[in-house]
Structure formats: structure tokens, C-alpha cells
């Protein structure tokens, strides 16, 4: 940022171990921001502003600077959510000096279901109408989909005093899940969101259930967008069905001249989808029905082999099951892969509700 840093906010956090939390901030944000570490301090720089965090007497002093009031609220929320996540249930006090009350999130968009259709036997697409699709055009592609209880007027969340999202409770409780904006139709002012259908005994899938039953006129909301697309001339993309909408969006947004290798694991050939792209795109489909976990040819083996054969300058993007993501992240670390040229995320965990 430059001289446009006109909106400022300060806060103080009292974690159980301030040194450890500062280390976690540096470790986590290196894949998402420009991280400048110094003795007892870190400066985070991103498109929405800067966060200057200093260690003072076992507390963290936070100074935010952003170009608009909206991005200031977003930055405050981002820092607050991460600090409580890093605390992992341990005591944490976080307060902000002269923070304004936010009754409704600045990046919350109420949308209306237009249609729902099956793309493949296990992937269902919901199209929603949005008054302003401008924020969704460009590099930020992930949103929280908010599904209100049926039969009640939606009560959308705001920001609490500590900067975290204040979710409605009781009868107004909302289901929230993270999804990818698969495509934006600017002229129609519509957004596409693909939902993986994966029924399993004893596993709740509220997001998938919503898509299965979605009706035109139904109201939901989106928080975002966030999660920028990788920018590189050469990309390695890897994931399963849960990551397929994101892989498809990355391929669609990639510029002509870029080279992309994609490894995608799906149930069988009926789950393969066309992936339009202006880039040079090579897709290797893996079929779960014909692969054996832990044997040569499995998803993890294919991804690690592809990483080992990366050309210099390749950005590696992987999204998959939690334990697989951890193994692939460890493999990248072992090979000394540049943290700024990778993004490895887990989208679901075996045996737990994720959709």
C-alpha cells in the first residue's frame, strides 16, 4: 500500500503465549501475504492493506492500515478469526480501540437461487442472481455460503466486538460452508456454485443437501470473495472432486501463454468435466474405482511425482483430503519448495462432515 493508507485501527491481543502466536502468524500468512519478519514484530502486506503486529510485554499490539473503511473491517475480521484459530481454545483476549459497530458484514451478499442442475452424477450446479457481481470478477474465488433455516426470514451475521463474525443463534442459526465461485455471468448478474454430492452413512452434508433441494427464489447469502488465484506462467494443479470447481476456475482464468498440468481424482469417467482454458492445459484424470490407496498410481503418488518433475518457477496448487494435504505439504517442504510458490489446502477430512 501507499499514501492511500487513510483508514486505521489498533488493537491489543493477550494470548497465553504471545511469542508462539507471532511465530504462527508468520508461518501461516507467508502463503497469503508479503510477510516481513523482524525481532519481535511482523508486517503483513496484502491487497487489502497492512497489519503491523508487535510483541510488547507478552501481548500483541496490532495496527491496521487500509485504503477503505470496508477493507479495514475485512482486515480486522481476518486478523481476529486467525488469532482465535491459532489460540486453539486457549484463553485469548482481543480488543480494538474505537472500533465502529458493524451490524452487517461489508462483504456479505444476499443472493437468490435461479436454477439447480446436475453437471455430472455427483456434481450439482446452483446458479444464483446477485445484484452486484463486480466483486466476484477477477482473482478472488472462494466464498462462505450461508444457508438460513427454512421457514424463517434470514438473520445475517455482523461483526462482534472482538472482530470475529457474530453468528445468529437459536432458531436463526445459519449453516456456513466454503465453496468456489465456478463462474461469473456478468451480463446476467449470475454466479455459478458447484456442490459435490457425496452421501455417506452417518455423515452430515448440509451444503450438498441444500444444492440437491434448492428451488428458484430461495434466499441465501455469500461472504467474500477471498482466496486469490495463483499467478504464474507454469502451474501444477491437483485435487479431487471437492477441488474440481476451483481447478476449473483457475484454468478458466489463466491467461493465454500459461502452461498448466492438472491431476484430478474422481470416482470414475462419468465425473470428468470439460475444463475450458485459454492456457495450454494438460489434464490427467485418475479414477478412484481403479486406483489402490498407498500403491503406485494413487493420487498422492502421482502428485508427488509431478512435484519432483516440476520445472523451475512452477506454482504448485493442491487441495484434497486433510491427511493427504499434510503429506504433500511435507513433501514440498522436504524438497525445499518456495513457500510463496505453493498453496496446499485440505477441503475435507475422512469421516467428518465437510460439505
PLM regions: where:
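Extended, composition-driven regions rather than compact fold-specific motifs
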Residues: 1-355
Amino acid at each position: 500500500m501507499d499514501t492511500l493508507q487513510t483508514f486505521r485501527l489498533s488493537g491489543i491481543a493477550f494470548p497465553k503465549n504471545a511469542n508462539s502466536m507471532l511465530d504462527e502468524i508468520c508461518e501461516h500468512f507467508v502463503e497469503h501475504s508479503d510477510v516481513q519478519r523482524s525481532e519481535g514484530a511482523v508486517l503483513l502486506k496484502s491487497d487489502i492493506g497492512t497489519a503491523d503486529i508487535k510483541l510488547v510485554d507478552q501481548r500483541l499490539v496490532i495496527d491496521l492500515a487500509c485504503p477503505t473503511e470496508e477493507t479495514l473491517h475485512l482486515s480486522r475480521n481476518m486478523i481476529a478469526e486467525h488469532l482465535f484459530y491459532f489460540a486453539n481454545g486457549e484463553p485469548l483476549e482481543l480488543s480494538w480501540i474505537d472500533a465502529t459497530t458493524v451490524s452487517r458484514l461489508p462483504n456479505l451478499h444476499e443472493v437468490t437461487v435461479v436454477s439447480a442442475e446436475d453437471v455430472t452424477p455427483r456434481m450439482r450446479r446452483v446458479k444464483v442472481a446477485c445484484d452486484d457481481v463486480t466483486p466476484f470478477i477477477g482473482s478472488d474465488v472462494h466464498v462462505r455460503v450461508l444457508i438460513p433455516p427454512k421457514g424463517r426470514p434470514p438473520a445475517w451475521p455482523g461483526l462482534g466486538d472482538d472482530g470475529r463474525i457474530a453468528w445468529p443463534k437459536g432458531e436463526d442459526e445459519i449453516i456456513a460452508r466454503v465453496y468456489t465461485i465456478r463462474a461469473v455471468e456478468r451480463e446476467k448478474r449470475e454466479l455459478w456454485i458447484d456442490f459435490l454430492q457425496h452421501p455417506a452413512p452417518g455423515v452430515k452434508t448440509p451444503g450438498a443437501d441444500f444444492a440437491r433441494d434448492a428451488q428458484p427464489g430461495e434466499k441465501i447469502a455469500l461472504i467474500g470473495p477471498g482466496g486469490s488465484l495463483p499467478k504464474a506462467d507454469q502451474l501444477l494443479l491437483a485435487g479431487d472432486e471437492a477441488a474440481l470447481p476451483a481447478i476449473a476456475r483457475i484454468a478458466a482464468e489463466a491467461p493465454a501463454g500459461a502452461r498448466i498440468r492438472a491431476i484430478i481424482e474422481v470416482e470414475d469417467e462419468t465425473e470428468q468435466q470439460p475444463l475450458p482454458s485459454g492456457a495450454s492445459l494438460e489434464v490427467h484424470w485418475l479414477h478412484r474405482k481403479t486406483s489402490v490407496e498407498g500403491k503406485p498410481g494413487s493420487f498422492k503418488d502421482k502428485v508427488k511425482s509431478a512435484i519432483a518433475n516440476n520445472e523451475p518457477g512452477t506454482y504448485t496448487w493442491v487441495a484434497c483430503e486433510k491427511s493427504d494435504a499434510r503429506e504433500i505439504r511435507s513433501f514440498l517442504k522436504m524438497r525445499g519448495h518456495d513457500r510463496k510458490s505453493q498453496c496446499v489446502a485440505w477441503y475435507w477430512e475422512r469421516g467428518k462432515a465437510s460439505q
